Each structure stands twice: as structure tokens, then as C-alpha cells.
From Swiss-Prot:
Family membership: Belongs to the YejK family.
InterPro entries: Nucleoid_associated_NdpA
Keyword Nucleus (UniProt): no
Record flagged with keyword Cell inner membrane: no
Protein's UniProt name: Nucleoid-associated protein SG1574
Length: 334
């Protein structure tokens, strides 16, 4: 599917010292060339594949007001982007890990949905070989490692103002999280908690199995069914839909999974994004601490792996060959 760019603008922040980020602002929007289209298509693809947090604008959000004004035609896109870059610089300059970069604002359409993407892209050095086979240095935008990115689903924001998921941004960074200062720049509050939704789903599945009085084998089959559906949705870039998931599971006492989860008050949305790490708990047990790391398939519990909660002891029958080899060699002093 093609990505159609409406407007795009680039600016730069140059780090002069620990407290100063200098601005270099474009006087004209960027022309939409094939190279620009390829860049945005790649940025959209990379961003879509990453784990994101959801937010909503607060009533005091200056950025939200500026976007509304721009959308109404009260301010042109370039002027909006220049002002917003200044606010972003002021916010980033408060933190010791602030770095310069190319600031990108792009309004585009993808699959009949309008988006506004804001990103700060770092620059990397590389080597270039020309037609004469001479080598020279070159620079490129480090799109694949971009971690300061936010995207507004303009269509959802304007048509469903009560939504809790029209604003997304990337999570996590060494030190203070990117999400923290980007939330300050966006003047946004936490929106849909994807991990909480997925944890709620796992709890609902376990309770559903308990209510049906399923044995361990049947319980694991249900968990595998749920995991398979959620994995397919994740790979397709689609949300988990309770009505679809419910259709894959056998009813309990003539009650569907969707009806069960609604009556039990798990507060699950009708649709929500899949969280890979949380959903892995459907088919795996994993944990680490005190120098020990364990990870095994859930169906092995009670078959080859046994846990005694009274003594907090885990017994493993049949160790992996590579581990057994290491233990044997260490015991024999080799």
C-alpha cells in the first residue's frame, strides 16, 4: 500500500554544549521527491514494528492547540513545525542526555488514515565507494534506531475525541525514558495501557479455564489457541478483537469468552494491541534472579518440570544436552 505525503518539513538541532541546542530552521517545506517518499515509507514501517505507548492530549497541550490551528488553516504547516521545533528544543535541553538531530514533521495518509509524525533522527557516518572506486565518507539518517518518535492518528483524534489511543510514542531509553520528556513536549497523559490490557486477557483466560473445570492438558490447549490467534494478529499488525478471539474458543456453560470476560469485569477493550512479551506467558514460563535464568514451555510443568511451593523447589527431569555436557565437563574438571 502506498503512503501519500501531504506536507513534510525538516529542521535541525545542533548540540553546542551540555546546556545549549542550537536550531537550524528551514524556510521552505521539503519537496516530496521519490527519495522523500522512500524515507517516509521506511520510517513508517520501522515505527509501526516497534513497541509503543499510548497517550492523550491534556487540555493544556500547546502542541494539540497548534495542530488544531494548523488543520483549520489558521497557520501553515511550515510555521507550525518551526514553532514546535523550538518547544521541543526547550524541553530536550532540560535533560543531560539531550542530543541534537534532524527534526522531522510529516503529515501523510496511509490506508485512508491521516497521520502526523514527529521524529528526531540521529545521523550516522559511513563509507561510500564511487564509480571510480574511490572511498569517501558520507552521512545518513539513522531511521532504524530512531527512539524519539511520536505519531498522531489525526483521523481518530478528530472523529473520536474520547479515544485513548490516537497518540503513540516510543518507549524506553538509558537513563530517563524518552517517553517521559516526550510526554512533556506533547503535554500528554497516559492513554490505553497495552500491557495492562494483555495482562487482563491472560487473567481472563485462566479464570475461563478454571470456570470450565479444565484439566492441565485442556487448559494448555486453550492457552495455545489464544496465543496462536494473538500471534497472528501481531504479525499482521492488527489488534486483538475479543469477538474474534471468542469465536475460536468453545463456550463454557453456553457462555462465550467475550460474555464471560465482560461479566467478570476485566475492563478489556473490545479491541487492543497485542503485547508480545506479555502474551509469551501463555506458552512459556520465564524468570531470572540471583544468578539464575529459567525459560521453559508451559506444557512441561507437571510432566518433566515440577514445582513444590512449600519448599519453593523446582525439579527438572532430563536436562538439555548442551547444559548436561557443560555440567559433566565441569564435574570431571575438564
Amino acid at each position: 500500500m502506498s503512503l501519500d505525503i501531504d506536507q513534510i518539513a525538516l529542521h535541525q538541532m545542533i548540540k553546542l554544549d551540555e546546556q545549549t541546542l542550537e536550531l537550524v530552521l528551514r524556510d521552505t517545506p521539503l519537496d516530496v521527491s521519490p527519495a522523500v517518499e522512500d524515507m517516509m515509507a521506511e520510517l513508517h514501517r520501522v515505527y509501526s514494528a516497534k513497541s509503543k505507548a499510548y497517550g492523550i492530549f491534556t487540555p493544556e497541550s500547546e502542541l494539540a492547540d497548534a495542530v488544531r490551528s494548523c488543520r483549520r488553516g489558521n497557520e501553515n504547516f511550515l510555521a507550525f513545525s518551526r514553532t514546535a521545533t523550538g518547544r521541543l528544543r526547550d524541553e530536550l535541553a532540560k535533560y543531560p542526555f539531550a542530543e541534537g538531530g534532524t527534526v522531522l514533521f510529516c503529515q501523510y495518509r496511509y490506508l485512508a488514515v491521516e497521520y502526523l509524525l514527529i521524529a528526531v533522527l540521529g545521523t550516522c557516518q559511513s563509507m561510500l565507494v564511487n564509480e571510480q572506486l574511490d572511498i569517501s565518507s558520507t552521512q545518513y539518517l539513522d531511521i532504524h534506531h530512531a527512539d524519539i518518535v511520536a505519531c498522531i492518528d489525526l483521523t481518530e483524534w478528530e472523529t473520536q475525541p474520547a479515544s485513548t489511543r490516537y497518540l503513540t510514542f516510543l518507549k524506553g531509553r538509558v537513563g530517563r525514558k524518552v517517553s517521559d520528556f516526550f510526554m512533556d513536549f506533547l503535554a500528554a497523559a497516559e492513554g490505553l495501557d497495552t500491557k495492562a490490557q494483555n495482562r487482563g486477557l491472560l487473567q481472563a483466560v485462566d479464570d475461563y479455564c478454571t470456570d470450565a473445570a479444565l484439566d492441565n492438558r485442556q487448559r494448555q490447549e486453550v492457552r495455545q489457541q489464544v496465543h496462536s490467534y494473538c500471534k497472528e494478529q501481531l504479525q499482521a499488525g492488527e489488534d486483538i478483537a475479543l469477538v474474534e478471539l471468542s469465536a475460536t474458543l468453545a463456550p463454557v456453560s453456553d457462555k462465550t469468552f467475550q460474555a464471560f470476560s465482560s461479566e467478570q469485569g476485566y475492563a478489556l477493550e473490545e479491541t487492543f494491541p497485542a503485547d508480545r512479551g506479555t502474551l509469551l506467558q501463555l506458552t512459556k514460563y520465564a524468570g531470572s534472579g540471583g544468578g539464575v535464568t529459567l525459560n521453559f514451555d508451559a506444557h512441561l510443568l507437571g510432566e518433566r518440570i515440577f514445582w513444590d511451593p512449600a519448599t519453593d523447589t523446582l525439579t527438572i527431569k532430563g536436562t538439555p544436552p548442551n547444559l548436561r555436557d557443560q555440567l559433566t565437563r565441569r564435574q570431571n574438571g575438564k
